[in-house]
Amino acid sequence: MTVLKIHIILFFALAINQAAAQKAKPYVSEVWVSDLGNGMYKNPVLYSDYSDPDVIRVGDDYFMTASSFNEIPGLPILHSKDMINWKLVNYAVTDLIPKEHFEKPKRGDGVWAPSIRFHNNEYYIYWGDPDFGIYMVKTKDPFGKWEEPILVMEGKGLIDSCPFWDEDGQAYLVHGWAGSRAGVKSILTINKMNPEGTKVLDKGIHVFDGHDANPTVEGPKMYKRNGYYYIFAPAGGVATGWQLALRSKNIYGPYEEKIVLEKGSTKINGPHQGAWVDTQNGEDWFYHFQDVDAGGRIVHLQPMKWEKDWPVIGIDTNKNKVGEPVMTFKKPNVGKSYPIETPAESDEFNDDKIGLQWQWSANENIVWSAKLPGKDYLRLFSIKIPDGEKNLWNVPNLLTQKFPAPNFVATTKVKLFPEDVKEGKIAGLLVMGMDYQSLVITNKPDGFYLQLRKAQKADKDGEEKILNEIKLKSNVVYLKANVNEPNGICTFSYSENGKKFENIGETFQAKPGKWIGAKIGIYSVSDSKVSRGGYADFDFFRITKN
């Protein structure tokens, strides 16, 4: 073999290895990174709407799940090695059941406040659907396929469930109640389960009533330590509440109660509902959410310690035995350091599948999109808006993701192909919530137009209106949304060459959805007068700094 051939082989081998290394390189957000790179971290660890988070450690691995409501795929699975740097790696459900029920957007319904546990070498997730009951899914591999959901307990208003297996093998399920369905809330109930955790065996026993001092107590998580049964539970409401700890030597009580985390003198409103996790080296930590309105319920991590068999979460700054949340702190000791990594946001649509950050508003129909191997774009078909709808609230084929930070820019490039239809195809960029605004390209008999559209009180059937309209030179346009503090102020702009962008319309105040934060994404639909044909190709979707 000649020296030249050897050099050529080495060159290509190096190129292949570099390409593989680049592909495997952790994604790092431009707009929010919790790891400060100096052994410290800042809260929130996730500035995204992973509401009602629950976290477990299995060996050296940490896994998180969160509420996903009607968004599909549902039950996100996030993975971390150091409790700070998280990657979205999977979902536990690909369809909500009953499948026919969730073919249409049931906003705010579906998956409420899940709990993840590791038992007998299997991973379990339990959640309450307020209309149908408590479900469970399990797997031996959290990165792989999860089994089909099992209805563990049927009933209305059953929410926020958490399993517990005692040392004697007995299995229990603690849960809360949704007043909107059950007619009562602010109580916690324990049911006995079969050892497999697939069904409850009794009507349950109420173990805590929060009506007197802890209204809206919900989201219970059960643990055992030093002979005490603990129920960690939030109370006081989503945006303004506090964290309770309940303890008893008997699983059915009576339970002592103590507030263990509150806002105090900090700016962190409603620091509650989450997970106690210990590290390999014996440290204790607590994850919880903070409701930030348009940004959703973002995830914080607090240091935790035990005093006289009570948890103290955060820092007890005023010595009242109640912790307050920290904004920065030393990273957990997990034995070694790991690279900075964040959940993916941008998507070049170069892979065979779209990124895991994307979710539909209902159970996915395969005809909504096509991501063909070897194609560097995502094709969204122009699906007809359901008859009688005045806005996008009940449109299932919206492809969106969570707000990734308080300040960011989202940019996409779209090409509209109406086929033989002369008007009524619509595709573009969307900031979705109970009020929403979109910047779209559409077609008319005389060409293509840019439109800024808006609906207020979309959840109350508010009519979508066209605010601005500009004639375009072609079927290609670049669309941008600039999102800023405070609370998601959005400015839309467009470009026909991808270089010079021009603002259009006035600023828009992003609004949360039903139990979720605002979402940003893309969509392609047909006006209700147009039944078929047409599609839009999206070349990329990028999240960058303002």
Pin down the residues of each PLM region:
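Bacterial Sec-dependent N-terminal signal peptides
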Residues: 1-24
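Carbohydrate-active catalytic/glycan-binding domains of CAZyme proteins
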Residues: 21-546
